[in-house]
């Protein structure tokens, strides 16, 4: 069984993907720019500004997405990333989590701290930067996810447990099983 889960920052991708992986005994794949920044001992905000936005060659995007593409070929995985539903072509179930920007900013603020207005602004800017980069690199419009997904869940007013239950119901309905 292969599950691919995408959504913008603050939608609960990591949390819900981890819950799915644990419940079904699947490998959880979630390698992000945060991980790369940690590996290089650089604060994420600095890494993002200098290495993601500050470069014109998209090196780190390609590095990250290539690594995720290779990992997505494995069986019995849950891949969580912004582009998971586009990267994991062979996923048995492709899920997109959606939430209003204000709710996502609130969640990010709770997780990372900061002032709401600053987090809201940086969330908007990050969304716009992500959209521009993915269009430039892959010709992917991350706001046009319906054609790539089997299931879209608006998580604006529901918690991770409720999201997990909706996904579990879909997995059970499709009779998806862990491969031996």
UniProtKB/Swiss-Prot annotation:
Reactions listed under catalytic activity: CMP + ATP = CDP + ADP; dCMP + ATP = dCDP + ADP
Keyword Transferase set for record: yes
MF (Gene Ontology): ATP binding; CMP kinase activity; dCMP kinase activity
CC per GO annotation: cytoplasm
Subcellular location: Cytoplasm
UniProt: ATP binding residues: 7-15
Tree of life domain: Bacteria
Record keywords: ATP-binding, Cytoplasm, Kinase, Nucleotide-binding, Transferase
One record GO biological process: pyrimidine nucleotide metabolic process
Main location: cytoplasm
InterPro entries recorded: Cyt_kin_arch, Cytidylate_kinase_dom, P-loop_NTPase
EC number: 2.7.4.25
Family: Belongs to the cytidylate kinase family. Type 2 subfamily.
Protein name (Swiss-Prot/TrEMBL): Cytidylate kinase 2
